[in-house]
């Protein structure tokens, strides 16, 4: 759910025979790609929403928007020069250039509620586990009915209903709520930082290579 994949590729190659002794060739290729990601979730969430559930997206102005988008582009250029020195001597020289541009986005938050819809505190089970966690194992074994009476069952039922009925304001990222939180925070504290940010992490790499191979047939055997 909420995923997309856009990619295309190209390959161009050309060779020029300058004369009987020299030739040059050039090749370039790449595959610009933009795609969204999905995530593994807990069994509780799978039970509510099924195996295709993906917590990384939500609606913004009626359109699906993913918080995890990968952009990748790895253009490569290879050039070769073939020099026939004599009938027995040859020099081949090659140059390669490769640039890897890889980035992926993710939500960040500061002094604010976790925006992930499947964060454990946002699930119905947390309302039960939070109460159980305040009692020891012996109390849980001997006084379970008393302990469970302290659980806000109405809240558990409400959250369960929202997940089962797929209230996307709860089950997916609530983009409008994030923007509203940032807006209100900016009104109250104009010099402060945003509560929520969409960061883009880059891992870029540039590589060049140069090699030259000389061959010479000394005699019929070498």
Tell what function each PLM region has.
Residues 1, 10, 26-32, 95-97:
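Transmembrane beta-barrel strands of outer-membrane/channel proteins
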Residues 24-26, 91-95, 220-222:
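Transmembrane beta-strands of outer-membrane beta-barrel proteins
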Residues 15-17, 23-80, 103-199:
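Acidic/polar loop-and-plug regions of large Gram-negative outer-membrane beta-barrel proteins
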Residues 12-16, 77-83, 93, 210-216:
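Residues on the lipid-exposed face of transmembrane beta-strands in outer-membrane beta-barrel proteins
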Residues 183-188, 198-222:
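Outer-membrane beta-barrel transmembrane domain signature of Gram-negative proteins
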Residues 17-21, 86-88, 219:
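Outer-membrane beta-barrel channels and translocator barrels
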Residues 1-12, 18-22:
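Outer-membrane beta-barrel translocator/receptor signature
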């Amino acid at each position: 759910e909420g995923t997309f994949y856009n990619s295309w590729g190209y390959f161009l190659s050309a060779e020029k025979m300058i004369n009987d002794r020299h030739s040059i060739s050039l090749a370039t290729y790449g595959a610009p790609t933009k795609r969204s990601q999905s995530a593994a979730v807990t069994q509780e969430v799978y039970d509510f929403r099924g195996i295709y559930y993906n917590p990384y997206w939500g609606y913004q102005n009626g359109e699906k928007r993913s918080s995890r988008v990968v952009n990748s582009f790895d253009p490569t250029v290879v050039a070769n020069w073939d020099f026939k020195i004599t009938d027995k001597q040859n020099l081949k020289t090659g140059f390669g250039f490769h640039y890897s541009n890889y980035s992926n986005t993710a939500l960040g938050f500061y002094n604010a509620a976790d925006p992930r819809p499947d964060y454990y505190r946002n699930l119905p089970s947390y309302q039960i586990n939070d109460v159980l966690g305040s009692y020891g194992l012996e109390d849980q074994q001997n006084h379970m009915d008393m302990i469970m009476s302290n659980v806000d069952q109405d809240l558990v039922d409400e959250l369960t209903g929202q997940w089962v009925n797929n209230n996307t304001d709860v089950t997916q990222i609530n983009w409008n709520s994030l923007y509203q939180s940032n807006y209100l925070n900016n009104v109250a504290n104009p010099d402060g930082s945003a509560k929520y940010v969409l960061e883009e992490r880059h891992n870029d790499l540039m590589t060049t290579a140069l090699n030259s191979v000389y061959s010479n047939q000394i005699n019929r055997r070498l």
